[in-house]
Amino acid sequence: ARGQTRLGDAPRAPLQSDTTAEATPTAEEVRLQVDHREFPSGVARELAQRGVTVAPTQLPVGDYLIDGRVGVERKTGADFVGSMLDGSLFRQVKALKQQFRRPLLILEGDDLYTARRVEPKAIRGALAAITGDFGVPILPSANTAETADLLMALLERSRREPGPAQLRPAAGELSPEEQQRH
């Protein structure tokens, strides 16, 4: 249905068209917003093929918004380098960090170092600044299908109760029966 998000068999929840702060949704109220400028990339089509209903919206920052908390900026290698060269990269990352509780950058494709003639050291410096100085995680993605898979994983995580990821215990800390289950 129009204006709703569907993730697998999860109940549908209306999409929000603004990024104003709101109460944290329950695990059953997963919302995904896609900036209308992102639709030509093919990621929205990939999400639709996975059962997610998306509707275009205009996000002031970022390309995807999950549950009003996770803001995702998607950049191809060429986009990343182009943003470095025109001076907009760090402004975009700073705005993403200020706007969302959990900002993420998805770096898509394998052309980061070949898209343009830019010193690899400069690219690595920008990557280090984004993660080290701004604290924004960078998730690598090979293509639009993998980007959709990453967004699906983020959607699934947001369905769960908020909290840190649960790490599996080290093998030596488990009984033989527990090791078989893991």
Placement of each model-derived feature along the sequence:
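Extended, alpha-helix-rich binding/interface surfaces that flank or overlap catalytic cores
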Residues: 2-19, 36, 53-69, 73-182
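Short, charged N-terminal beta->alpha structural module
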Residues: 19-51
